[in-house]
Amino acid sequence: MTKNGVRSMNYQNQMKLKRFFRKPVVTYTFLGLQLILFLLMTIDGGSTNTFTLIGYGAKFNPLLVAGEWWRLVTPIFLHIGWVHLIMNSVILYYLGIQLEDTLGHWRFAAIYLLSGMLGNAASFAFNAFSVSAGASTSLFGLFGATLFLGKTYTGNPAIQHMARNFGTLILINLVFGFFNTSVDLAGHIGGLAGGYLMSTAISIPDPLPRWKKKRVLYGAGFAVLLILLLSIGYFRTLGAF
C-alpha cells in the first residue's frame, strides 16, 4: 500500500472515531448498564424482591452505616419493575442526547453520577427505613443542569426553551412527590441540588476570575452538603436501628 493510501486510511479511521464520540456514548452506556442489571435481577429473584435489590446494591441504611458507601452510587442503575425502568430510561435518553452534546462526555458523566450520589445521600439522611433504587436522583441532577444552563446562556433561545420545559416538569414532579409517599422526595431534591451545584462547578470552561471563584465555591458547597447529609443519615440510622 502506498503512503497516500495509508494516510487516507488513517484519516478515515480518525473521522470514524470522531463521529463515534459525537454520539451520546455515556448515555448509551448508562442505559445499557441499567438494562443489564435489571435483567440479572429479574433472573436472580426479581427486581421487586427486596432481598434481590439489597444484594445488587440498593440504598439500605444499615448497610451504608456498616461501611458499604458504594451504595450511594449503585442504586442509580437499579430499577424496581419494568415500568420504573422504562420511564427512567426514556427520560435519560431524551435528556442525555441533548445534555451530553452540550456539556461534553466527561462533564455529563460526572454530573449524572455525583448528583445521583448526593440524591442518595439525602435519601440516606431522611428516609432511614426505605430500600430505594432508581435513576431518578441522577435524572433530577440533569434537571438541575438544565436550570443552570438556562440561567447561564440567557441569549440562547434553544437552551431557554429547554430550561423552561424542564422547569415545568421539575415543579410537577416535586408536587407529585410531596403527595405520594412512595416517591423518594428527599432523593429527588438532593439530586436536583447536586446537579445544579456540580454544573456550576465543572461545566463552564471560562478562564475569567469570577467564574473560577464561583466554580470553587459551588464545588465546596457540594462537598459540604454531602458531608452534612451523610452525617445526618449516619446518626439518624444509628438512633433508628
PLM segments and residue spans:
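Hydrophobic alpha-helical transmembrane segments
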Residues: 27-32, 109-113, 166-167, 171, ...
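Structural signal for membrane-spanning alpha-helices in multi-pass inner-membrane proteins
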Residues: 38-45, 123, 127, 149, ...
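N-terminal TM1-TM2 helical hairpin plus the immediately adjacent luminal interfacial "cap"
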Residues: 23-133, 181-183
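Cytoplasmic-side transmembrane-helix entry/capping segments in multi-pass membrane proteins
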Residues: 104-114, 134-139, 159-166, 216
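Alpha-helical transmembrane segments that form the membrane-embedded catalytic/substrate-binding core
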Residues: 85-92, 133-145, 184-202
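C-terminal transmembrane module of polytopic alpha-helical membrane proteins
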Residues: 1-22, 174-241
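Membrane-interface helix-boundary motifs at transmembrane edges
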Residues: 100-103, 154-160, 205-214
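Residue-level signature of the transmembrane alpha-helical core
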Residues: 35, 113-117, 138, 143, ...
